[in-house]
C-alpha cells in the first residue's frame, strides 16, 4: 500500500475502536482485556512502558522495521491509556497545537 492509499484518519479510526472496546468489553478483545484487567490501569501502564523500552532498543539498534513495529505498539498502548483517562485525540491535538 502506498502512502497515497493509506487513510489519513488511521489514528482517529484506531482511537474509535479502542473507545468502543472500552464501552462494550467484548470477551475476545485484547483491548477490552486491558480495560477489564484485575490490575486495572497498571496493566496498561506496564504495557506502555514495555513498548517504550522496546522502541528505544529498536532505535538503538537502528532497526527501521522494528522501530516502525514497536512505535505502532507504543502508540496503540498510549491510546489505550489516554482512553482510560478519558483524554481524547482532540485534547491531544489541542495540547500539541499550543506547542507549535
Swiss-Prot record:
Under the heading CDD domains, the entry gives: NTP-PPase_HisIE_like
Q: Name one GO biological process term.
A: L-histidine biosynthetic process
MF-aspect GO terms: ATP binding; phosphoribosyl-ATP diphosphatase activity
Q: Does the keyword Ribosomal protein apply?
A: no
Gene Ontology cellular-component terms listed:
cytoplasm
Query: Where's it mainly located?
Result: cytoplasm
Pathway involvement of the protein, from the record: Amino-acid biosynthesis; L-histidine biosynthesis; L-histidine from 5-phospho-alpha-D-ribose 1-diphosphate: step 2/9
- Extract the InterPro entries matched here: HisE, PRib-ATP_PPHydrolase-like
The record's section on Pfam families has: PRA-PH
Q: Which reaction does it catalyse?
A: 1-(5-phospho-beta-D-ribosyl)-ATP + H2O = 1-(5-phospho-beta-D-ribosyl)-5'-AMP + diphosphate + H(+)
User: PANTHER family recorded for this chain?
Assistant: HISTIDINE BIOSYNTHESIS BIFUNCTIONAL PROTEIN, HISTIDINE BIOSYNTHESIS BIFUNCTIONAL PROTEIN HIS7
Q: What is this protein called?
A: Phosphoribosyl-ATP pyrophosphatase
The lineage, from the top, is: Archaea, Methanobacteriati, Methanobacteriota, Stenosarchaea group, Halobacteria
Q: Tell me what gene encodes this.
A: hisE
Amino acid at each position: 500500500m502506498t502512502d497515497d492509499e493509506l487513510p489519513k484518519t488511521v489514528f482517529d479510526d484506531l482511537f474509535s475502536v479502542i473507545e468502543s472496546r472500552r464501552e462494550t468489553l467484548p470477551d475476545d478483545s485484547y483491548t477490552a482485556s486491558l480495560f477489564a484487567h484485575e490490575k486495572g490501569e497498571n496493566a496498561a501502564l506496564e504495557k506502555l512502558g514495555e513498548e517504550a523500552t522496546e522502541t528505544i532498543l529498536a532505535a538503538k539498534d537502528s532497526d527501521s522495521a522494528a522501530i516502525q513495529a514497536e512505535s505502532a505498539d507504543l502508540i496503540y498502548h498510549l491510546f489505550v491509556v489516554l482512553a482510560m483517562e478519558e483524554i481524547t485525540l482532540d485534547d491531544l491535538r489541542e495540547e500539541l497545537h499550543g506547542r507549535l
